[in-house]
């Protein structure tokens, strides 16, 4: 490849899927001879892997792009790439807004980055957003960690939630084969990785698009069976997965998590709203009663399991009483962590053009009230850790205190304790918890 920039920088916005995509694209760039630059302003190639789930994330991308577009006016050899969901959604329109961009690459094309770059270096301005079958991973990702790793098991989403752009920007569901997933995990185990998170926009949909059904009519491939299939991969000591959908979540999956010792006691199951009418308007496909039953089933079999979720406030037409149903659900379930957001109208989604939009003031007020309750309930949940001995996988140094290291419990609770990172990085350490906060813990080596 001619005229290759020597140094590259990737800025990633949004979800774990985007982070995994960025790692794959970084691996492609390094296979092509590029070297990582910590400072974007010193890089010859800059890639923004973008998120369009909310408007503020999208506007941040344009702010970053504007600065680098000005730089390109004096450094014409700078290569600007926009990847991810904004790239997919905006396409040619993004080029009209920021003509300095060289390559626009949607999520389904991430594995084609090398071929598309060749076209750029040959003098073309390239837009790759057409729906395609995703190429199997053929490049070793440049992982941000050598302890934990993400492994995609399914791309895309077939749901049609009325607020969500994901199906439009990430395409239909495409499952990787069990053999390909296990092979990637085996390679990670050989490289010394300890923990893997299996990823999917709707991980419970895994296998529905793969060929074959059982005699009873069940899909031959499903996520629960996949967990059993990959559980014994050598070297991998912990398994996590995200994200689950209440509509498809099964008791069989809970039982598998209970039986398989490597699977961590943590479930991320977004509920989005605690009101049935809002859930119906969102086209989520379940009721708050069904969601409560899922959590009850988990806690019956795994009483100490950590539960995290996502919630949206201020959905079009949401009344005060309907919002209070969300507060009631959060209060009664008690989440270990809850990712909250005020509703943000996204272009191309049905809810964005409804007449009953709420004011920003109302949405902000409800978000603040929900966040206050979330912190209160998380603090209550943290109390169960006080005095306990927890197994912590040490990942890094505490960025706020160099004398401490940090890692996570099996329940995904961030934990800090005094220790030497050079000695402890990548090791499992028994820690006695001496201090608890809503979303983190402090302890001492036991």
Curated annotation (Swiss-Prot):
Give compartment(s): Cytoplasm
Domain MTTase N-terminal residue range list: 6-122
Subunit and partners? Monomer.
Entries under PANTHER family matching the protein: CDK5 REGULATORY SUBUNIT-ASSOCIATED PROTEIN 1, MITOCHONDRIAL TRNA METHYLTHIOTRANSFERASE CDK5RAP1
Q: What is its main location?
A: cytoplasm
Looking at the record, the residues that make up the Radical SAM core domain are: 143-380
Q: Does the keyword Phosphoprotein apply?
A: no
This entry carries the following GO cellular component terms, namely: cytoplasm
Output this protein's name. tRNA-2-methylthio-N(6)-dimethylallyladenosine synthase
Q: Name one GO biological process term.
A: tRNA methylthiolation
């Amino acid at each position: 490849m001619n005229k290759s920039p020597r140094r590259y920088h990737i800025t990633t916005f949004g979800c774990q899927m985007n982070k995994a995509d960025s790692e794959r694209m970084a691996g492609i760039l390094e296979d092509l001879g590029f070297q990582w630059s910590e400072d974007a302003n010193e890089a010859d190639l800059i890639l923004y892997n973008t998120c369009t789930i909310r408007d503020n994330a999208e506007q941040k991308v344009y702010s970053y792009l504007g600065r680098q577009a000005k730089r390109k006016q004096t450094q014409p050899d700078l290569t600007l790439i926009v990847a991810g969901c904004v790239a997919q959604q905006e396409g040619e329109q993004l080029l009209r807004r920021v003509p300095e961009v060289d390559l626009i690459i949607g999520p389904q094309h991430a594995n084609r980055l090398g071929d598309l770059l060749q076209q750029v270096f040959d003098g073309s301005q390239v837009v790759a957003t057409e729906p395609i079958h995703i190429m199997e991973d053929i490049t070793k990702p440049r992982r941000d960690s050598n302890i934990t790793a993400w492994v995609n098991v399914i791309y895309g989403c077939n749901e049609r939630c009325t607020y969500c752009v994901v199906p439009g920007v990430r395409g239909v569901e495409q499952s990787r084969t069990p053999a390909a997933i296990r092979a990637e995990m085996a390679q990670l185990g050989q490289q010394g990785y300890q923990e893997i998170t299996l990823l999917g926009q709707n991980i419970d949909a895994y296998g529905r698009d793969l060929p074959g059904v059982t005699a009873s009519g069940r899909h031959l491939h499903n996520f629960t069976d996949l967990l059993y299939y990959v559980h014994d991969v050598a070297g991998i000591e912990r398994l996590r997965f995200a994200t689950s959908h209440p509509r498809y979540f099964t008791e069989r999956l809970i039982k598998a998590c209970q039986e398989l010792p490597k699977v961590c006691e943590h479930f991320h199951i977004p509920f989005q709203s605690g009101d049935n009418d809002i859930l119906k308007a969102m086209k989520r496909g379940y009721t708050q009663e069904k969601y409560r039953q899922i959590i009850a089933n988990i806690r019956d079999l795994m009483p100490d399991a950590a539960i995290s979720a996502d919630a949206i406030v201020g959905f079009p037409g949401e009344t005060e009483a309907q919002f209070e149903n969300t507060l009631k659900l959060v209060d009664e379930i008690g989440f270990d962590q809850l990712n909250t957001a005020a509703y943000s109208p996204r272009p191309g989604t049905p809810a964005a053009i409804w007449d009953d939009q709420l004011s920003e003031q109302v949405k902000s007020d409800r978000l603040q009230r929900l966040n206050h309750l979330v912190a209160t309930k998380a603090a209550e949940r943290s109390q169960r850790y006080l005095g306990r001995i927890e197994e912590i996988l040490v990942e890094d140094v505490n960025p706020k205190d160099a004398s401490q290291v940090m890692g996570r419990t099996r329940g995904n609770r961030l934990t800090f304790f005094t220790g030497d990172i050079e000695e402890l990085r990548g090791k499992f350490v028994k820690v006695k918890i001496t201090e608890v906060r809503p979303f983190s813990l402090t302890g001492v080596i036991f």
